[in-house]
Amino acid sequence: MKKSISVLRKESQIKNFISTIITNELTNANIYNPTVTDVVLSTDLGHVKVFLAFSSKENDGLDAVKNASGYIRKRLSKTLNWRKVPELHFYIDEVEKKAFEIDQILNSLKNEE
Protein backbone atom coordinates (compact mmCIF):
# COMPACT_ATOMS: atom_id res chain seq x y z
CA MET A 1 0.00 0.00 0.00
CA LYS A 2 1.29 3.42 -0.96
CA LYS A 3 1.94 5.85 1.88
CA SER A 4 0.38 9.28 1.87
CA ILE A 5 2.50 12.37 1.58
CA SER A 6 1.65 13.43 5.13
CA VAL A 7 2.90 10.10 6.54
CA LEU A 8 6.12 10.39 4.53
CA ARG A 9 6.59 13.95 5.79
CA LYS A 10 6.02 12.86 9.38
CA GLU A 11 8.50 9.99 8.98
CA SER A 12 11.07 12.44 7.69
CA GLN A 13 10.48 14.79 10.64
CA ILE A 14 10.80 11.95 13.14
CA LYS A 15 13.96 10.66 11.46
CA ASN A 16 15.61 14.09 11.61
CA PHE A 17 14.65 14.75 15.22
CA ILE A 18 15.61 11.30 16.51
CA SER A 19 18.92 11.46 14.66
CA THR A 20 19.69 14.84 16.23
CA ILE A 21 18.67 13.69 19.71
CA ILE A 22 20.71 10.46 19.57
CA THR A 23 23.87 12.04 18.18
CA ASN A 24 23.87 15.29 20.17
CA GLU A 25 22.04 14.70 23.45
CA LEU A 26 22.65 11.10 24.51
CA THR A 27 25.97 10.70 26.32
CA ASN A 28 26.08 6.94 26.84
CA ALA A 29 29.50 5.47 25.99
CA ASN A 30 27.88 2.44 24.35
CA ILE A 31 26.27 4.58 21.67
CA TYR A 32 29.17 4.82 19.25
CA ASN A 33 28.63 6.57 15.92
CA PRO A 34 24.88 5.90 15.51
CA THR A 35 23.04 6.39 12.24
CA VAL A 36 19.27 6.42 11.84
CA THR A 37 18.85 4.55 8.57
CA ASP A 38 15.08 4.33 8.31
CA VAL A 39 11.88 5.24 10.12
CA VAL A 40 8.55 3.49 9.50
CA LEU A 41 5.42 5.09 10.92
CA SER A 42 2.32 2.93 11.40
CA THR A 43 -0.87 3.90 9.61
CA ASP A 44 -2.59 4.87 12.87
CA LEU A 45 0.46 7.03 13.77
CA GLY A 46 0.72 5.24 17.11
CA HIS A 47 3.99 3.36 16.60
CA VAL A 48 7.32 4.10 14.95
CA LYS A 49 9.95 1.56 13.96
CA VAL A 50 13.38 3.19 14.03
CA PHE A 51 16.20 1.32 12.31
CA LEU A 52 19.70 2.13 13.55
CA ALA A 53 23.22 1.29 12.42
CA PHE A 54 26.24 1.50 14.70
CA SER A 55 29.90 1.33 13.71
CA SER A 56 30.66 -0.99 16.65
CA LYS A 57 29.00 -2.59 19.70
CA GLU A 58 25.62 -2.83 17.98
CA ASN A 59 23.79 -4.71 20.74
CA ASP A 60 25.14 -2.46 23.50
CA GLY A 61 24.25 0.63 21.48
CA LEU A 62 20.75 -0.65 20.79
CA ASP A 63 20.20 -1.44 24.48
CA ALA A 64 21.39 2.05 25.44
CA VAL A 65 19.05 3.70 22.93
CA LYS A 66 16.14 1.54 24.10
CA ASN A 67 16.85 2.60 27.69
CA ALA A 68 16.74 6.23 26.57
CA SER A 69 13.52 5.82 24.56
CA GLY A 70 11.46 7.60 27.22
CA TYR A 71 13.74 10.62 27.05
CA ILE A 72 13.70 10.57 23.23
CA ARG A 73 9.90 10.39 23.18
CA LYS A 74 9.66 13.26 25.68
CA ARG A 75 11.94 15.40 23.49
CA LEU A 76 9.87 14.50 20.42
CA SER A 77 6.69 15.60 22.19
CA LYS A 78 8.21 19.02 22.82
CA THR A 79 9.35 19.53 19.23
CA LEU A 80 6.66 17.86 17.09
CA ASN A 81 3.50 19.56 18.42
CA TRP A 82 1.40 16.52 17.53
CA ARG A 83 -1.68 15.52 19.46
CA LYS A 84 -0.23 12.06 20.11
CA VAL A 85 3.47 11.19 20.04
CA PRO A 86 4.01 7.66 18.69
CA GLU A 87 5.55 4.86 20.72
CA LEU A 88 9.16 4.20 19.71
CA HIS A 89 10.53 0.77 18.75
CA PHE A 90 14.24 0.49 17.94
CA TYR A 91 15.85 -2.16 15.73
CA ILE A 92 19.30 -2.81 14.30
CA ASP A 93 19.36 -2.29 10.55
CA GLU A 94 20.58 -5.51 8.93
CA VAL A 95 20.59 -4.22 5.34
CA GLU A 96 24.32 -3.42 5.22
CA LYS A 97 25.24 -6.85 6.57
CA LYS A 98 22.99 -8.60 4.06
CA ALA A 99 24.39 -6.51 1.21
CA PHE A 100 27.95 -7.35 2.28
CA GLU A 101 27.12 -11.08 2.43
CA ILE A 102 25.54 -10.98 -1.03
CA ASP A 103 28.56 -9.10 -2.37
CA GLN A 104 30.90 -11.76 -0.95
CA ILE A 105 28.84 -14.54 -2.53
CA LEU A 106 28.87 -12.79 -5.90
CA ASN A 107 32.63 -12.22 -5.69
CA SER A 108 33.25 -15.87 -4.84
CA LEU A 109 31.12 -16.96 -7.79
CA LYS A 110 33.00 -14.55 -10.04
CA ASN A 111 36.35 -15.95 -8.84
CA GLU A 112 35.24 -19.54 -9.52
CA GLU A 113 34.64 -18.80 -13.20
Swiss-Prot record:
Organism per entry: Mycoplasmopsis agalactiae (strain NCTC 10123 / CIP 59.7 / PG2)
Protein name per its UniProtKB record: Ribosome-binding factor A
Top-level taxon of the source organism: Bacteria
Known function: One of several proteins that assist in the late maturation steps of the functional core of the 30S ribosomal subunit. Associates with free 30S ribosomal subunits (but not with 30S subunits that are part of 70S ribosomes or polysomes). Required for efficient processing of 16S rRNA. May interact with the 5'-terminal helix region of 16S rRNA.
PROSITE patterns, per database record: RBFA (PS01319)
Lineage, uppermost ranks: Bacteria, Bacillati, Mycoplasmatota, Mycoplasmoidales, Metamycoplasmataceae
Region forming the signal peptide: none
GO molecular function ontology, one term from the record: ribosomal small subunit binding
Quaternary data: Monomer. Binds 30S ribosomal subunits, but not 50S ribosomal subunits or 70S ribosomes.
Stored NCBIfam families: rbfA (TIGR00082)
Name of the gene: rbfA
Keywords: Cytoplasm, Ribosome biogenesis
One Gene Ontology CC term in the entry: cytosol
Record's subcellular location: Cytoplasm
Family statement: Belongs to the RbfA family.
Any single biological process term in GO: maturation of SSU-rRNA
Record-linked Pfam families: RBFA (PF02033)
